[in-house]
Amino acid sequence: MEKIVLLLAIVSLVKSDQICIGYHANNSTEQVDTIMEKNVTVTHAQDILEKTHNGKLCDLDGVKPLILRDCSVAGWLLGNPMCDEFLNVPEWSYIVEKANPANDLCYPGNFNDYEELKHLLSRINHFEKIQIIPKSSWSDHEASSGVSSACPYQGRSSFFRNVVWLIKKDSTYPTIKRSYNNTNQEDLLVLWGIHHPNDAAEQTRLYQNPTTYISVGTSTLNQRLVPKIATRSKVNGQSGRIEFFWTILKPNDAINFESNGNFIAPEYAYKIVKKGDSAIMKSELGYGNCNTKCQTPIGAINSSMPFHNIHPLTIGECPKYVKSSRLVLATGLRNSPQRERRRKKRGLFGAIAGFIEGGWQGMVDGWYGYHHSNEQGSGYAADKESTQKAIDGVTNKVNSIIDKMNTQFEAVGREFNNLERRIENLNKKMEDGFLDVWTYNAELLVLMENERTLDFHDSNVKNLYDKVRLQLRDNAKELGNGCFEFYHRCDNECMESVRNGTYDYPQYSEEARLKREEISGVKLESIGTYQILSIYSTVASSLALAIMVAGLSLWMCSNGSLQCR
C-alpha cells in the first residue's frame, strides 16, 4: 500500500512534456456580422464602406469640371449674354449645373428635346465652337435688329450670342435658302429656332409676311415648322415665345434651311472634338481647387474601399454605391482570449476548432501556432506556412467581392420634361428598386464572406491539430483542450520536429510504450488494492450489522417484547 501511494506521488510531481495547438488573440474590440451571428468580435476587420467626402467639386484626374455657375446648359449653348464667360470653354471632365440656374432662356420659350441633349452631353468632353453662317452674310435681312430687353447686356437689349434673330429689311423678308456642308471629321451640334409672335400685328411688323414657315432638312431630318400666333401672359416682359431645336450633323452631311419668316438662324455650331465619360451634375457647390478620381454632386471621394453610401450619382473610378450604413469585412479570427474561457459557436462552413477554448495573446507573429512546455522551458511559435496561406486568402477577399459585384447598376440621373412626369416617377421607382436589390446583395455577400472567413480560420486550426495528432499517434495523449501530453521526454529539438512535420515516431515509440505500461501498471495495482479494501469493508459492515440485529433480538426477548422459544 505504501509503495502505491509513493508511486502516485512521484507520478503527480513529474509534469509531462506538452504541446498545444492554438490561435492568435489580441485586445481588439472590432465586430462583424455573419449569417449566423451579429456583433462577433474579431482580431482584425476592414471597413469596406466609404462614408466620407470632402464637400468640394474637384478636377477629375487632372481635368477641370465645367461649372456653369448661374447659367444653365441651354444658356451656355445658345449664348445667353449673362453667360459670356462660357462662350469658349476648354476640355471638361464633367459639367455642373445648379438646380434652378438664373440665366437660362432669357427670351421665354422652350428647348426641344432638351433632356436628350443633356444626355448626349454626358458622353462629350470637349466642344470647339465654329462659325457656320456668318452674321454678316444676311444682306437681305436685318441681322442686328433682332434683340430683346429680356436678354440685356450692359444695360441694353441683346440676344443669344450663337444664333441670329432675322427681321424684315426695307419692308420685305425674302425667302431664305441656306445650306451648310459639314466638311469636318467630327460630328457637329447645330442649333436653330422659331419665333411665335403674340399677335398678327407683331407677325407683320417683324416679318412682313402673315403666313410663314421654316423647313430644315438633313440626310436624317425632315422638319417643317410654322409659327403659333397666340395671346400669352408676359414672361420677362415678353408675350412672344421662341422654340429652339437641335440636331447632330454627321461628317459630309449637309443641313438645309428654307424660311420666309420667324427664323432664328444658327451662326455658330459646336464641333464635338472629344467624346468620353462625362456627366451633368446638379450641384450648388463651387470649385474646390482639388483633384480626385471620383466625384459626386455633394463632394469628391478619395477612397480605395469597394463600396460607398454617399450619393448614387458618381463619375470617375468610384466605389460601388449601396444604401447600407455599415459593411465590415472580417480579415482576422474570432477574438476569444483564453482568459474568457468562451467556446466558439458552430458556423455554417468548414470544420470547427471548438475544442480550443480561447486564443493566445502571447503569440503575436502568426494567426495559428503552438505552445510547448518541457524541461527546457515553454514558449509560443507561430505556424508560418498555414498563417501565410490564410493571409494570402484573406488579402484577395476584397478583390473577390468587387469581382462578384462588377455588374454595378448605375443611376445616371436622367432628366424628363413636364410631359414625362409619370415616366420620371416610374424611372425613380425602378432605380430605387435596383439600388435596394444591389444593397441587399452586397450585404448578403459580406455576411457570407465573414462566415466563410471565420470558419476558414477554425478549419485551419483543426487541420493543424490533426497534423500533430497524426504524427504523434500513441506517443502522446490527447487532453481534449487542444493539447497533447507526451509519453516520452520531448526536448526543444523534438518540439521543433513536431511543428515542422518531421517528428520521428519510431525514435520515441519504445520510451512512450514503457511510460504507457508504467502508468497502466499503477492503475491496475491501484484498482486491485481498492477491490480488496472494498471486499473487507463490505464483510466488516455485514458482520457489524448481524451483531447489532442479534443483540437487539436478545434484548427484546428478555423484556417480553418478543416471544423466544
UniProtKB/Swiss-Prot annotation:
Sites where a glycan is attached: 26-27, 39, 181, 302, 500
Site (Cleavage): 346-347
One term of GO molecular function: host cell surface receptor binding
Extracellular side: 17-531
Keyword terms of this UniProt record: Clathrin- and caveolin-independent endocytosis of virus by host, Clathrin-mediated endocytosis of virus by host, Disulfide bond, Fusion of virus membrane with host endosomal membrane, Fusion of virus membrane with host membrane, Glycoprotein, Hemagglutinin, Host cell membrane, Host membrane, Host-virus interaction, Lipoprotein, Membrane, Palmitate, Signal, Transmembrane, Transmembrane helix, Viral attachment to host cell, Viral envelope protein, Viral penetration into host cytoplasm, Virion, Virus endocytosis by host, Virus entry into host cell
Topology term for the membrane: Single-pass type I membrane protein
Lipid moiety-binding region (S-palmitoyl cysteine): 557, 564
Gene Ontology BP annotations: clathrin-dependent endocytosis of virus by host cell; fusion of virus membrane with host endosome membrane; fusion of virus membrane with host plasma membrane; virion attachment to host cell
UniProt KW Nucleus keyword: no
Residue spans, topological domain Cytoplasmic: 553-565
Chief site of localization: virion
Family, similarity comment: Belongs to the influenza viruses hemagglutinin family.
Complex and partners: Homotrimer of disulfide-linked HA1-HA2.
Further comment: Major glycoprotein, comprises over 80% of the envelope proteins present in virus particle.
Functional note: Binds to sialic acid-containing receptors on the cell surface, bringing about the attachment of the virus particle to the cell. This attachment induces virion internalization either through clathrin-dependent endocytosis or through clathrin- and caveolin-independent pathway. Plays a major role in the determination of host range restriction and virulence. Class I viral fusion protein. Responsible for penetration of the virus into the cell cytoplasm by mediating the fusion of the membrane of the endocytosed virus particle with the endosomal membrane.
Protein known as: Hemagglutinin
Organism whose genome encodes this protein: Influenza A virus (strain A/Chicken/Shantou/4231/2003 H5N1 genotype V)
